[in-house]
C-alpha cells in the first residue's frame, strides 16, 4: 500500500469513527456501489479529494466529490458542524504519515476544502428544506382538492 492509499484508508477510518451509523458501510473492504452505496460513495469521494489536495485543486472535481459526500451527510442525523468537519482529521493523519508532503501547502488546502465542505453542506440542507416545503404545499393542495370534491 502506498502512502496515498494509506492516508485515504486512515481518513476513511476517522470518518467512520465520527459517525457510528455509517461505520460498517465505510469499513467494508471493497464496497459495491449497489450493495453498499454509502460506503462506495464516501470512499470514492475521499479518494478524489485526496487526489485534488495533492494535485491542482480543480474546483469542479472538488465540488463533485464534496457534493456526493455531503448529500449523504446532510440527510443523516448529525449537526452541520460534524457533517462538514470530516476534512479536519486529515491534518493529524498527514502529520503522522510517512511520506514527503508539503505540510504547509496541504494545511492551506485543507482549510480551503473545509470551507468548501461547509458551503456545500449548507447548499444540500437548503435543497432538502426546499423539497420539504414543496412537498408540504403539494400535500396541502391535494388535501384542499379532496375536501372540495367531498363537499
Give short role names for the model-derived ranges.
Residues 1-68, 99-151:
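Core of compact, soluble alpha-helical bundle domains
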Residues 71, 86-87, 110:
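Generic preference for hydrophobic/aromatic residues in regular secondary structure cores
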Residues 78-97:
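Elongated alpha-helical scaffolds
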Amino acid at each position: 500500500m502506498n502512502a496515498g492509499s494509506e492516508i485515504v484508508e486512515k481518513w476513511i477510518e476517522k470518518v467512520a469513527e465520527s459517525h457510528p451509523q455509517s461505520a460498517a458501510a465505510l469499513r467494508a473492504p471493497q464496497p459495491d456501489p449497489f450493495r453498499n452505496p454509502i460506503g462506495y460513495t464516501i470512499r470514492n469521494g475521499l479518494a478524489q479529494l485526496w487526489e485534488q489536495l495533492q494535485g491542482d485543486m480543480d474546483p469542479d472535481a472538488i465540488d463533485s466529490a464534496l457534493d456526493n459526500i455531503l448529500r449523504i451527510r446532510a440527510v443523516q442525523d448529525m449537526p452541520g458542524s460534524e457533517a462538514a468537519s470530516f476534512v479536519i482529521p486529515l491534518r493529524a493523519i498527514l502529520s503522522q504519515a510517512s511520506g514527503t508532503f508539503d505540510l504547509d501547502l496541504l494545511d492551506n488546502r485543507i482549510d480551503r476544502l473545509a470551507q468548501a465542505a461547509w458551503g456545500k453542506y449548507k447548499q444540500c440542507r437548503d435543497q432538502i428544506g426546499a423539497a420539504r416545503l414543496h412537498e408540504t404545499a403539494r400535500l396541502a393542495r391535494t388535501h384542499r382538492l379532496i375536501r372540495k370534491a367531498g363537499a
